[in-house]
Regions:
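Conserved motor-coupling elements within RecA-like helicase/translocase cores
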Residues: 104-125, 132-141
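Conserved helix-turn-beta segment of the N-terminal RecA-like "Helicase ATP-binding" lobe
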Residues: 78-116
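Conserved RecA-like ASCE P-loop NTPase motor core of nucleic-acid helicases/translocases
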Residues: 69-76, 101
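Hydrophobic residues in beta-strands of the RecA-like P-loop NTPase core, especially within AAA+ ATPase
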Residues: 45, 126-127, 145-146
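Pre-Walker A segment
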Residues: 1-71
Length: 200
């Protein structure tokens, strides 16, 4: 991974809150994972509002600036729209294209998005599991972010696997760990706990 450190620092400095110690630790762990030469398989576990989305955005930026595409898969349309808004606002000063797919986009819109993903014109896609039904192909996928994996059905988890072989995978969950680990199809090796509440 060839990270543009200057751009990354610029991106990080736009975070309007103070990072918690757990956030900093997790971001550093992800950075090490991405440079290790092995596909990352990390679970980030923390309560709602503890800053998992910012961690996902930093990981995305690292991959995007290295020339890879990113996909974030969410269980609900509401989450897709929420993440799309947050990511779009956070990335608006940088030259990356972000799109979304859920059941509310028209077939024509989906077709156009699929074509642009294949050509590498879209850098980051946020989608529900509709992505599996839409035969989406990426030009250069580097990172899969899975939001609340335990909300996906068995069939959807099986389909997730085919995206996975050489990609980095970051799974976010607010569910306490034991249940998540039992239900995890990915046999996750590395776990980051976000236990520090936000500073403000």
């Amino acid at each position: 991974y060839d990270l543009n450190s200057f751009e990354y620092e610029k991106f990080s400095s736009q975070f309007e809150f103070t990072e918690t110690s757990d956030q900093i630790k997790t971001i550093n762990q992800i950075r090490e994972d991405l440079y290790s030469g092995q596909p990352m398989d990390r679970l980030v576990c923390g309560d709602v509002g503890f800053g998992k989305t910012e961690i996902a955005m930093r990981a995305s930026f690292m991959c995007l600036s290295a020339g890879y595409q990113v996909v974030m898969i969410c269980p609900k349309v509401l989450l897709v729209n929420q993440h799309f808004k947050t990511f779009s606002e956070r990335f608006n000063k940088f030259n990356y294209r972000i799109s979304k797919i859920s059941r509310f986009e028209s077939n024509n819109e989906k077709k156009k998005i699929k074509e642009e993903l294949t050509k590498g014109k879209i850098n980051l896609l946020i989608s529900t599991h509709a992505i599996f039904a839409n035969d989406v192909k990426f030009q250069k996928l580097g990172l899969i972010i899975i939001d609340e994996e335990q909300s996906f059905g068995v069939e959807q988890k099986e389909k997730l696997k085919r995206f996975k072989p050489s990609c980095h995978v970051l799974t976010l969950t607010a569910t306490p760990i034991p249940r998540t680990l039992q239900s995890s199809i990915f046999k996750i090796k590395d776990i980051s706990l976000i236990q520090t509440p936000p500073v403000n």
